Amino acid sequence: MEFPVVDYPATLGRAYDRLYVAEADGPSALPTRLARVTVPDGEATTWSEPGAFPGEPIFVRAPADADTEGALLSVVLDAESDETFLVVLDATTMDELARATLPHRLPYGFHGQFYAADDPVRSMA
């Protein structure tokens, strides 16, 4: 398991009951799936696609009145089609909600970071 993330604003300094990770399945050195892991039992719900290598998951919390925990975003390299896409998953079920193919292939990267346009300081929110 690599790149573990939690809902930082809701769990900072407190116990949490789930985390999201990228993990390798089989002999691959690169992550081949994204997983929602419940703590402490280690039960995992996953998303994967043949020939696809997801990057670091980014958790986006849903509004308080939503029926889901939020969304999980990841930039994915599809080695079979030589394309890169952004996948949006339901963070509760790990079902794919949306996908946006980028106009050009991005090399596989280790971390994905997002910055507010008016604040270059990294935000965990």
Briefly describe each language-model feature range.
Residues 1-125:
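Beta-propeller domains
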